[in-house]
Curated annotation (Swiss-Prot):
It is an enzyme of class 3 (hydrolase). PANTHER family: STRUCTURE-SPECIFIC ENDONUCLEASE SUBUNIT SLX1. The keyword Zinc applies. The keyword Zinc-finger applies. Its cofactor is a divalent metal cation. Its main location: nucleus. Belongs to the SLX1 family. One of its GO terms (cellular component) is Slx1-Slx4 complex. It is found in: Nucleus. This is Structure-specific endonuclease subunit SLX1 homolog 1.
Length: 529
């Protein structure tokens, strides 16, 4: 389980002789990597060491769940003309070079179908420099619109110090972790914790070392395999991999059924709508009463005592409304449906189980996107299915190889035993001996009769009943084989052996065909749906 911070960064040269030069790379610690490129510490890139120092970190893209996806993003950013996702759009950047070209490719890459479905974050460390480059890009290519924050893409302007404290440092309370250690990853928060926020945020966001993460992952894996890992919402057991999880895993322990989380999304949407409608209704009623009081005071028909009673009635009405609203009552004093509930029922659309808006996580309050959660579920389900089918095929192939080896060993042993039972060439058999066995008196008489009929010109192959019935013990398989071998000589032995091997090969081929028919599978490519 990979728990590191994966990001793809963009560097630009501060050397006036290399103005506009850029470098794109992948790392788990962009601040430490910047020091390596500038030569402060060892293990820098050869390209940045040769020319262009000092380098400046402009931005980086994070939010990749594993290094494979981050490396794919890096390759597409470095080779946009070879990428199948960008090569058809690269005509828009014709005539754009150097740093504006890299920024333009980033704009196109973040809008590609593959990466637009991920919850990514664009960290901008030099907003002024990036703003000038984007303005230059807009002047040359007006068709490329600037990046804006969406439900899946988050854009933040941040300093290197705050970036270190939020994403890379291992500071928890008064304790400090190793300097530059990427295995101490913090749990980033979208905003500062509120004093009135529930304790679930504090309980979910904590600093974990690599050993703790591996230990927790192993424990959860054991529970999932035993069907004992409970759902975070309904406490019923989960079945791997058909469950959804927070994108901040392993820093958030949310693991729930798909239907449970969908109902949570619907519940949160209804709560937000009720709060918004209640606030707007209270504002409207307060405005009506204030306007009425103002009109009465302007006319001069209301004295101080009357105005006091009006204000008192206003406060009482507002208190009654809030209390009835908290109690969940939908009836007014006369027993009819209140105007607020009537307007709510009339304006509220039909609720569906499929969420359409982002919702905060039940444990860490981070915004969750339903499309990203389902995409992650489909990806894990396809990988799990492929892994199980691969294991099944390997087991079948191992069983077939073992059976084939056993058949070969048995055929070799049988050949050796047959060679021992076959009489040598030129060896004389005793009279009355048939294929190594002594023929009885009835057999001798049958042989004599057969020879007499052959001398008379009779067809020996059409009349063999006397011989077949008179022989006391028919020869066995080995004896018959030995007899045929002794009669035909070496050529007959080779022909018989070849026929036997062909029969065995045919049987093994039939077995393989039958078994391989069972291993044929058709993957449900959910990712292409």
């Amino acid at each position: 389980m990979d728990t590191r911070f994966h990001c793809v960064y963009l560097l630009t040269s501060l050397d006036p002789q290399c103005a506009g030069e850029y470098y794109i790379g992948y790392t788990v610690d962009p601040i430490r990597r910047l020091r390596q490129h500038n030569g402060e510490i060892v293990s820098g890139a050869w390209r940045t060491k040769r020319r262009g120092r000092p380098w400046e970190l402009l931005c980086c893209v994070s939010g990749f769940g594993e290094d494979r996806i981050a490396l794919k993003f890096e390759w597409c950013w470095q080779h946009p003309t070879k990428s199948t996702r960008l090569k058809t759009q690269m005509t828009q950047l014709r005539g754009v070079h150097r740093l504006p070209y890299a920024v333009g490719v980033l704009h196109l890459l973040l809008r590609a179908d593959l990466f637009a479905r991920l919850q990514l974050t664009l960290h901008i460390f030099e907003p002024e420099r990036v703003g000038r480059v984007v303005a230059e890009l807009q002047g040359r290519v007006p068709s490329i619109s600037p990046l804006v924050a969406t439900s899946l893409l988050r854009i933040e302007e941040i300093t290197k110090e705050r970036f270190m404290s939020l994403y890379l440092d291992g500071v928890s309370g008064d304790g400090t972790a190793g300097d530059g250690c990427v295995y101490f990853v913090t749990a980033p928060l979208s905003s500062q914790p509120d004093v009135d926020a529930p304790s679930r945020r504090v309980r979910s966001c904590r600093y974990l070392s690599e050993e703790d993460v591996f230990r927790q992952h192993a424990r959860v894996k054991e529970l999932l395999e035993a069907n004992q890992c409970p759902c975070a919402l309904c406490s019923l057991p989960l079945r791997s991999p058909y469950f959804v999880r927070c994108y901040r895993t392993p820093f958030c322990a949310l693991r729930a059924h798909l239907a449970c989380l969908a109902m949570w999304f619907t519940y949160e949407t209804m709560q937000k709508r009720d709060v918004t409608m209640g606030q707007s209704t209270r504002n409207e009623r307060s405005g009506e009463y204030s306007n009425k009081i103002k009109d009465d005071s302007n006319d001069g028909t209301m004295d101080a005592h009357a105005s006091g009673r009006q204000l008192h009635s206003l406060s009482v009405n507002n208190a009654d409304f809030s209390s009835s609203r908290d109690a969940g009552s939908i009836l007014d004093s006369s027993g009819h449906i209140s105007a607020f509930e009537e307007s709510r029922c009339a304006s509220s659309p039909s609720l569906t189980l499929l969420p359409c808006q982002p919702c905060p996580c039940p444990l860490c309050d981070e915004p969750l996107q339903w499309g990203a959660l389902v995409h992650d579920l489909k990806r894990r389900a396809v990988l799990e299915k492929r892994w199980m089918e691969r294991q099944r095929r390997e087991k079948i192939e191992a069983a077939l190889a073992e059976r084939l080896q056993r058949l070969q060993n048995s055929s070799l042993t049988e050949r050796k035993s047959r060679r021992k039972a076959t009489p040598a060439l030129g060896q004389k058999r005793n009279r009355g001996e048939y294929c190594g066995d002594t023929v009885g008196d009835g057999g001798k008489e049958a042989v004599t009769n057969w020879r007499a009929r052959a001398m008379d010109g009779c067809d020996s192959w059409n009349d063999t009943n006397d011989f077949s019935h008179s022989v006391s013990l028919p020869p066995s398989r080995d004896e018959g084989y030995a007899c045929d071998s002794s009669r035909r000589g070496v050529g007959g032995s080779k022909h018989t052996t070849r026929m036997t091997d062909e029969g065995k090969n045919d049987s093994i081929t039939d077995i393989c065909d039958c078994v391989l028919q069972l291993t044929e599978f058709n993957l449900d490519e959910w990712l292409d749906a």
